[in-house]
């Protein structure tokens, strides 16, 4: 779907953005419906993780100014006209000149469920040596109706700088692959998206990217839900950090600020009408299976996935005597990383937990 659209000055078409394969593009669509891509790699405004975003503006003569990003730099102001693309700011040069960033590569693999093509990215530690063995970290995106992509991510680079190979996939339900792919989780979430993530892990193991004995996992929001689901389904990970999760669709639906969005979209009916299905799709239903040492993290002002969701997992693991700790971040909303000090705190706690439970 398109977004951020503006009429051209002659009213003969619109400029808009859309996502394709984890890349946000700027396009022009005329009144006959013919479209043309004008720029790519829009974004870089999401400080923490490699989500889409960014903005653009079009002058009367069709010159476009937009925020451009890549794996290697946050957003920079860039101008494009019919002849050339020019980057006109270098805001990050001073910051990055003394930093060595990890290389990022795109990977594609097949889903074991239905043979669909699944896209992901792998970030390597700086000065990566393929002859060495590195811990392998899965980072699950939120949404789930969103996408990761070929964009700068401070969190990914911090994990890579700490010596981790970081894998971040776009399983089914992600945007930028068409309507049908995005709707595969309708009344079925979480489900085969879990298999898509694990298939990516196995792809990386088969291709010598990951060591099957050095696996770790984290993710926030819907990514926290996926992380909790993964450790409830298998014991392959050395340790996990579940950030601002949905743990219980019944309590989440009835306590979150967006309580009105779930009936007939995520699951069918209201919780009191479809109690068993709400429970069956809740990661808390799997807490009896979890053997993985797990840190749970949440912002204390989070209205989207309230602290009570995180505490359900924490208390369940405490009752089962599984190694766990609860990190509550004061004054933090659902967007924990919006405050840079919280971003650093988040990453530092995650790395400390993995170090404690290698």
Regions found by a protein language model. Name each.
Residues 5, 26-28, 56, 77, ...:
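Hydrophobic beta-strand positions in blades of beta-propellers and related beta-sheet-rich domains
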């Amino acid at each position: 779907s398109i977004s951020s659209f503006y009429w051209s000055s002659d009213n003969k078409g619109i400029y808009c953005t859309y996502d394709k394969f984890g890349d946000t593009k700027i396009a022009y669509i005329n009144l006959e419906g013919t479209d043309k891509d004008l720029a790519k790699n829009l974004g870089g405004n999401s400080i923490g993780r490699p989500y889409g975003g960014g903005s653009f503006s079009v002058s009367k003569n069709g010159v476009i100014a937009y925020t451009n990003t890549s794996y290697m730099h946050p957003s920079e102001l860039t101008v494009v006209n019919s002849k050339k693309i020019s980057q006109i700011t270098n805001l990050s040069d001073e910051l990055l000149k003394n930093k060595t960033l990890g290389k990022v590569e795109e990977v594609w693999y097949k889903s074991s469920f239905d043979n669909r093509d699944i896209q992901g990215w792998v970030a390597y530690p700086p000065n990566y040596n393929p002859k060495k063995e590195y811990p392998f970290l899965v980072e699950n995106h939120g949404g789930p109706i969103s996408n990761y992509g070929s964009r700068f991510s401070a969190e990914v680079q911090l994990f890579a700088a700490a010596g981790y190979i970081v894998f971040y996939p776009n399983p089914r339900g992600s945007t930028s692959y068409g309507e049908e792919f995005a709707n595969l989780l309708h009344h079925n979430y979480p489900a085969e998206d879990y298999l898509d993530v694990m298939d990516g892990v196995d792809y990386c193991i088969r291709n010598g990217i990951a060591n099957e004995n050095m696996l770790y996992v984290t993710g926030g929001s819907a990514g926290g839900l996926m992380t909790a689901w993964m450790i409830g389904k298998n014991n392959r990970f050395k340790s996990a950090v579940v950030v601002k999760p949905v743990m219980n669709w019944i309590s989440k639906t009835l306590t979150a600020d967006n309580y009105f969005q779930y009936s007939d979209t995520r699951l069918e009916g209201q919780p009191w009408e479809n109690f068993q299905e709400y429970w069956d799709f809740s990661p808390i239903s799997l807490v009896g299976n979890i053997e993985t040492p797990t840190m749970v993290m949440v912002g204390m002002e989070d209205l989207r996935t309230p602290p009570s969701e995180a505490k359900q997992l924490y208390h369940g693991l405490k009752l089962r005597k599984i190694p766990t700790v609860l990190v509550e971040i004061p004054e933090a909303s659902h967007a924990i990383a919006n405050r840079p000090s919280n971003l650093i705190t988040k990453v530092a706690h995650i790395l400390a937990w993995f170090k404690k439970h290698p």
